[in-house]
């Protein structure tokens, strides 16, 4: 078989100490073969030097729409300040699609550089920010598809029942490609229960 890439002399995570290193053949962006001294030709060969090869990291909870905004918020230095959500809420009306895209791209690039290959990001929708955060992050799915699988969770950070219009924005987010629905139950009163 011909490969696009062969990583030679690599150690798999489940390999026993006495097992020899192995080769990994990649074709069309996918692992096509794993075997010691893999035959066939390759457009590119990389020496693993006996180093560990493992699955990429998964970032399961990040908010790309709000990444890198600390300088815009008047936040305390405590781990989780009581007013953090309110301070973010006060500045998110300034978000533009282009602004979100630029900030989120920088964060994604850092995550890719540290080995992340899958990411689930929560993106706020409400009448204050509309769909700008979602559109800004959505623009990055195809741009970074080569390195990371980006899943978007649409989320009513400031509440659903207490924030008229949020439900329509959530539906629009789901119709627009979001695959997961998040929630912020601490913002909802208990009278309806």
Model-flagged regions — what are they?
Residues 55, 60, 86-127:
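Hydrophobic alpha-helical hairpins/lids featuring a short glycine-rich hinge
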Residues 68-100, 172, 177-180:
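Active-site gating loops and adjacent loop-to-helix segments of metal-dependent hydrolytic enzymes
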Residues 91-94, 121-190:
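Metal-coordinating catalytic core of metallo-dependent amide/deamination hydrolases
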Residues 1-41:
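N-terminal metal-binding scaffold of metallo-dependent hydrolase/deaminase domains
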Residues 10, 24, 29, 50, ...:
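Divalent metal-coordination and catalytic microenvironments
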């Amino acid at each position: 078989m011909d490969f696009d890439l062969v990583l030679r002399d690599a150690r798999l995570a489940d390999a026993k100490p006495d097992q020899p290193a192995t080769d990994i053949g990649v074709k069309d962006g996918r692992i096509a073969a794993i075997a010691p001294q893999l035959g066939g030709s390759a457009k590119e060969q990389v020496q693993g030097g006996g180093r560990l090869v493992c699955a990429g990291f998964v970032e399961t909870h990040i908010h790309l729409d709000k990444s890198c905004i600390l300088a815009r918020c008047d936040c305390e230095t405590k781990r989780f300040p009581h007013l953090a959500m309110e301070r973010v809420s006060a500045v998110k009306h300034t978000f533009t699609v282009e602004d979100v895209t630029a900030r989120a791209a920088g964060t994604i690039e850092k995550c890719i550089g540290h080995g992340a290959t899958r990411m689930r990001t929560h993106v706020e929708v409400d009448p204050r920010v509309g769909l700008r955060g979602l559109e800004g992050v959505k623009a990055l799915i195809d741009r970074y598809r080569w390195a990371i699988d980006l899943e978007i969770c649409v989320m009513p950070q400031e509440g659903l029942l207490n924030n008229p219009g949020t439900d329509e924005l959530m539906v629009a987010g789901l119709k627009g490609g979001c695959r997961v629905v998040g929630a912020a139950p601490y913002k909802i009163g208990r009278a309806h229960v």
